[in-house]
Amino acid sequence: MKAPYAWLLAGCLATGGAHASCGAAFCSSSNDWLTLTQDVAAGWRAWMQAEYIKQDQLRRGTEKLSPGQVASHHEEVKTLNRNALFGLEFGFMPEWSASLVLPVSNREHLHIHHHHGTPIPETWQYDQIGDARVTLRYQPATRATGNTSWSVQGGLKLPTGRTDVRNADGDEAERSVQPGTGTTDLLLGGGIARRLDALPGTLFANLTLQAPLDENGGYRPGGRAGLQAGWLLPVQGRLDLILQGNVLHLMRDRGIHAEPEDSGRTEVALVPGLAYAWSRQVSVYGQLELPVYQRVNGIQLAHDYALSLGLSFVLD
């Protein structure tokens, strides 16, 4: 892929954080699609991303469990996440841009409540807006003219998602599977991308942090830290191969309506994918997240893979 297209796509892949908007249930940690490797462009840029994550594997620590191994009053069975993320970025100064990300979640959750030895399945299914994210990004234009580009960003996750979704029986879902957390969270991040003379393509890395600033109704979600690093490798023409690795650490939830014993996790994943620059304005991409290490606190549901597909375009 020619350099201008490679820089465009590397920027789309370098700053993780889309996971910050889908409530406390698991969402993809791979992408945030904010441009890193080019100057802040004046005007508007939009992107949309679809995610599929099926959590149906019980884990205790790093060990996989079968349902028969769990002796609990409350047995988790499945959480199916189909998320759509919509992002909009506006470059209002040569080195500054502002962005808004709004998630929409289609989520199905099933657990079994054991009442005096009788298993009672309880299910929830909803389509809801999650917690929005607003950020400011600073990228020195002078640094993007050479082989290295970097940026920093900060912002807030806002409590726009509901925290009181109920099922057909009138039972309220656990706070961890609600579309929103009810809290305002601080978001910080920074990334770097570099083209090396000795290697084709672009290397990139990004660190993101998220910390709740308050609690809501006796619930405070755990903080998050994510590290993404990878290599955007030209394949042919405008097609690039994405070789990426992610590390995600989630702290325990707190509060009287939280489940601190069964929340918090550490995950390492390989994330291969493809990116195609349709034009200088439009890019499409797809990635497959494959966990290679998962450690959970207590007993939790985990996933075997996650899939994301997206589209990014500049609005002239």
Show where each model-derived region lies:
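Residues on the lipid-exposed face of transmembrane beta-strands in outer-membrane beta-barrel proteins
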Residues: 36, 48-50, 86-90, 100, ...
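Transmembrane beta-barrel strands of outer-membrane/channel proteins
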Residues: 46-54, 100-104, 152-158, 205-209, ...
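Outer-membrane beta-barrel biogenesis signature
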Residues: 18-68, 145-147, 151, 316
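Residues that define the transmembrane beta-barrel architecture of outer-membrane proteins
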Residues: 42, 78-84, 126-132, 148, ...
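Detector for outer-membrane/organellar transmembrane beta-barrel domains
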Residues: 42-56, 175-256
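Outer-membrane pore/translocation modules
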Residues: 106-221, 316
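Repeated loop/turn-to-beta-strand initiation elements of outer-membrane beta-barrel proteins
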Residues: 44, 96-100, 143-145, 198-203, ...
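Outer membrane beta-barrel transmembrane domains
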Residues: 59-68, 215-316
